[in-house]
Amino acid sequence: MRKIVISALLFGCAVLAGAVSHAAQDALADDLTPISRQDWNAVRAAHLLERAGFGGTPDDVARFTAMGPAAAVKALVDFSGAAQADANRHLLPFDESGIHDPGLEPFPTGRPAATDQAKATGEALGIKVKPTGNRRMQPVVDKFFYWLRASRLETDRLAYWWANRMLTTAAPLQEKMALFWHGHFANNEEKVRDYRKMKRQLELFQAKGTGNFRDLLIGAAQDPAMLAFLDAGVNVKGAPNENFAREIMELFTMGVASNGVANYSETDIREAARAFTGWNYQDLSFKENADKHDGAVKKFLGQSGNFDGVQVIDLILGQPATAEFIAAKIYRYLVREDVSDAVRKQLGAELRNNRYELAPLLKKILLSRDFYSAPSMATHIKSPVELAVSTYKKLDLKEVPGVPDFNDATGALGQRLFHPPTVAGWAQGKSRITPGLLLERGNFARDLLFPNINFLPPDRYNQDETIRIVSSKIDQGQDVSTATKPEGKGMGGGGEAMQSMSTAMADRDEDFNTRYGSFRGWQLATQKVKPIPRRPAQLDLAGLVRSQKLLNATQVVDYLLARFIPLAVENADRARLVDFLKNELGTDDVVQAQSYLEEPLRLLLHLIMSLPEYQLG
């Protein structure tokens, strides 16, 4: 079976690239008029659920088919109200571990900054330096590493919480657009170093992600996670830092150029940077330091005035290029990679004419004939998060499995929530389908269907070899200096006595031990951060087959293909799947094989999920 899977995955690179690059044209392409009720069917309803959410079960597809296109799109876009709130009563707030304390603020830029502060003031991170004795600043160092480790682990829990919302929400477009904005306003926890700020930013995307773009943009620009990520604190009067202004203009609003014409100049960036001087944050709040703001006249995008940051944002929103840039990026996310100039201009006008309200734009896109055209359907290569959540959805799971680990699995595929690689977000499209990544996608399916009995929870088992070695040596009773001595540095022979003497001296004289602090930080973090539940996927494929009254291998294969694949597979692939199932069952009679049906079905589904067509949505 492994040989079949690998061959399919490697061949799939060419198949997927061809499917995305050479999708057939039809009369619906680039037509933004609404699709009619007469043209509505189950295939298009399933397509809508895939793109505006994370897919659906056959029951979901049947319900949206019966609604018709206008009602179906309205239900997805207009998700606020009492009925929707009632449908989402099961969605609980994030269950905090309670790991933060006020002494952590403001968190130092690094370990040296923490110990320098402790040395200068006698206190840092809410911890006082010991008056006398060995390693007087060790508790400060321990606290520093504790917060780094605890915030990372709590962020992983936050990602699980969000993935469960994606899976079970009655408002899938809310979470789908939150995922879009997370990649658009891309900040990562490694730089922000505070899960609370990442959580606040996610809540902003969930609350305003389908509302008014101006409100969302100002909220994101003044968000503590964004300000921390883009080093806003160093942007002050007399020494403006252009990084913040450049990212807002280049990545978040206008784009560098439209049709080869620059949308702004380097002078515009410098002047915008002056307008943003004084913007900073304090803990979880936006803070505007008036004494650090440049209040002089600025010249920006052809306008002159004493502009502040919000006024600069409004000037940016007044540019036609901004509405077109945002509308086109949303189109590429929901529809397809290539957007024609005509469509870009129409959608930009739609957004601008509605004063940057996103809901009318989303309705226009999702109702358009273009959205259901051949170039748009089954041509989107699913992101790792889309792949994982849509897989859980099609399996009708009620919770994200703990095995395999959701964060590690999606990270191996190239997308770990709250950890985008750059401020530009994650790679899109064909970059997701290298041979190595396709093999990882097959491995994800395998680990989901056949959980690894040797699985070690990454939030409990430290994967840093150095920390594991230190932990082992401490458990053996070694003193701190000996336990933290780098491996392979022993002198041998008589040098051991000299090393013992130097170790003893170090134990007496050092102010702190960084390696011990790193170990102790992990130890404290795992004590305080709540563990991620590790229940594997609760599957009953045999029960599913029985409920559908499927009698032979061909019926089983056709049912599973229809449920999991958005387009028809090659006849030869279908025939191989049927033959595979017959061989595993030892018969074509599914009823006769009831007592041992589950494992062959899981093997079959692994093959289906490893097909190149399964990567498309």
Name these PLM-found stretches.
Residues 25-41, 46-58, 94-98, 319, ...:
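Flexible, low-complexity segments enriched for small/polar residues
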